[in-house]
């Protein structure tokens, strides 16, 4: 009877995937077993693999996934029989980030506590990963965006492939680069972090390797072979895991026309103190060079939320001087402002225009950079109210281990 029930559950779930519940499973009456199905587990030898498993939604993260990842990773960290941990995604994505359409509906329904819980569960897992005591391998074989970068970059090893697409596209939907992005982006070479955070434009797997976001690169068809080699390891030594990865890894060269080849130009344009100065500098270079890259970059900046651009620039600059936990605590405040606070209309408008109505014509408020005041930006970095608690991270406990 139990086996028949399990088989029926799998059939129902397969039908849900096939018939296109693409945006969110949060609104369905799901059992705890159904929710656990969003993060599967594989075990072999002394390794465990967490599999993000919402393929029709490109493995977008939910609150339950954040909690489940925390529970699994804490148990694995404490288990002396487990030496290292891996993470990968089902289907054609690693992870497209947080389930922003579900967040949009939570915002429009007026569910602030559920929004708080989402960010708390996700950011707490990211901190756990960033302080994890065992080697961690993230296999980024596909779309890796937004929160998907947050649940992978803080780990020990990140394997990119020819199918990897990296981006932090939050400003285009009226939000800010979060999930630890202000820490991760701010530590990239030169002003690459400012470019990625403000424009949300993409990097390839080879570009990720070149700038340090990835530690290794492999062709996607070789990923199963690499996984099998890793699963044979009986170790908790990161150098042994690294040696295995390096035996499977390949040399990758970024495209000659890509952004990695333009580090000097990024320094020239994105080192300015304000978004207005950055745009002015790009416009000068575009007129001088007649370069399609400059034109594409300018167009993307002008399509993004003016407030989000200024917030993102300040966030990345602050992140350069902060630890991961400080960045996550600050980003938590910012995320609540962006979804619950007085300026949350930009997020709703961005998601509506890009993902709901898809008219690609968001009406930003303020509508232009010159109308974004310093007070507006300052408010984005403040707690919602004087009594609003900050994100509670176990900093003393984790850093004393």
UniProtKB/Swiss-Prot annotation:
Subcellular location, principal: mitochondrion
InterPro entries membership: ClpP/crotonase-like_dom_sf, ECH_dom, HIBYL-CoA-H
Keyword Mitochondrion in record: yes
Pfam families linked: ECH_2 (PF16113)
GO CC aspect terms: mitochondrion
UniProt key word Mitochondrion: yes
CDD domains: crotonase-like
Keywords: Hydrolase, Mitochondrion, Transit peptide
Subcellular location: Mitochondrion
NCBIfam families: PRK05617.1
UniProt similarity note: Belongs to the enoyl-CoA hydratase/isomerase family.
Listed name of the protein: 3-hydroxyisobutyryl-CoA hydrolase-like protein 1, mitochondrial
């Amino acid at each position: 009877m139990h086996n028949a029930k399990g088989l029926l559950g799998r059939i129902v779930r397969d039908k849900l995937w096939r018939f296109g519940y693409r945006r969110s499973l949060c609104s369905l009456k799901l059992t705890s077993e159904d929710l656990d199905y969003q993060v599967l587990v594989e075990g072999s030898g002394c390794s465990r693999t967490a599999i993000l498993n919402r393929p029709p939604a490109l493995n977008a993260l939910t609150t339950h996934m954040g909690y489940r990842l925390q529970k699994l990773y804490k148990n694995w960290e404490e288990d002396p029989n487990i030496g290292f941990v891996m993470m990968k995604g089902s289907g054609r994505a690693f992870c497209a980030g947080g389930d922003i359409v579900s967040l949009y509906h939570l915002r429009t329904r007026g569910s602030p506590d559920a929004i708080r819980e989402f960010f708390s569960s996700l950011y707490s897992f990211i901190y756990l990963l960033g302080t994890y005591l065992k080697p961690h391998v993230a296999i980024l074989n596909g779309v890796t965006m937004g929160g998907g970068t947050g649940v992978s970059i803080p780990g020990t090893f990140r394997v990119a492939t020819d199918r990897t697409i990296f981006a932090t596209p939050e400003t285009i939907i009226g939000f800010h680069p979060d999930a630890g992005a202000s820490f991760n982006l701010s530590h990239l070479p030169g002003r690459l972090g400012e470019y990625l955070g403000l424009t949300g434009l993409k990097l390839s797997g080879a570009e990720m390797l070149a700038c340090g976001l990835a530690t290794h690169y492999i062709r996607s068809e070789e990923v199963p072979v690499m996984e099998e080699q890793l699963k044979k390891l009986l170790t908790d030594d990161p150098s042994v895991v690294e040696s295995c990865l390096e035996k499977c890894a390949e040399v990758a060269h970024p495209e000659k026309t890509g952004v990695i080849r333009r580090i000097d130009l990024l320094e020239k344009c994105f080192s300015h103190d304000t978004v207005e100065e950055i745009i002015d500098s790009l416009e000068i270079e575009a007129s001088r060079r007649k370069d399609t890259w400059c034109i594409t970059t300018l167009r993307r900046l002008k399509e993004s939320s003016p407030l989000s651009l200024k917030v993102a620039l300040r966030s990345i600059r602050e992140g350069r001087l902060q630890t991961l936990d400080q960045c996550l605590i600050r980003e938590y405040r910012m995320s609540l402002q962006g979804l619950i606070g007085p300026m949350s209309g930009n997020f709703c408008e961005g998601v509506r225009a890009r993902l709901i109505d898809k008219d690609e014509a968001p009406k930003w408020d303020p509508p232009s950079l010159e109308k974004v005041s310093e007070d507006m930006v300052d408010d984005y970095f403040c707690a919602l109210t004087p009594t609003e608690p900050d994100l509670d991270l176990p900093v003393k406990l984790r850093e004393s281990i």
